[in-house]
Amino acid sequence: YKRQVPIAPDAAPLGTAAEESRSIKAVAKRFGADLVGIAEIDLRWHYATRVDVRDFSKAPNELPDGMTHVIVMAHEMAPELVATYPSALAGAATGMEYSHEAAIAIQLASYIRHLGYDAVASMNDTALAVPYAIQAGLGEYGRNQMVLTPEYGPRVRFSKVFTSLPLAAAAPRRLGLHDYCQSCTRCADSCPPRALPFGGPEEGGDSPPTIRG
């Protein structure tokens, strides 16, 4: 995560947590996010350590004190480019959305800090995006190992903003997508390196790689 601007010394007056959640979602969409959800911070999804890029050593992966919620944003990838996978154009769609989401997350974190509350923007660092996106009600986990959203399917990238702003967390939604994946194997059948599982989800034990060659 990164801090971009100082926290305003005087906190802005707030409404209820539900009101602030609606407001912050509207602001995030104004900045360019396509989907927005909110979850309580759950340390199960956080990386144990991070890499200090100055010497590539392990460093503690700790958020600032007082963080209580994470705002999860989904960013749609261009369908006409994604449809060309595997190609350089599809790779460009990925890179373009990473740049886009970084700008949006930093803007939202800066906005919250101007309100007088702490906020840090995060992309792929700090914590896993997939379980947080599910926890924030943005979609369900699919056989393809991705979050399936009802609006865009898996064609999204995620960013996060950790914050101390009092918000109301969403609940995971049962959309029927996860259940559908239990009987459908179309993505696994179509995967050239056979990297996707055919059976149902399992918990615990080793997870041997399915890629051959």
What is each stretch, according to the model?
Residues 1:
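Conserved small/polar residues in nucleotide/adenosyl-binding loops
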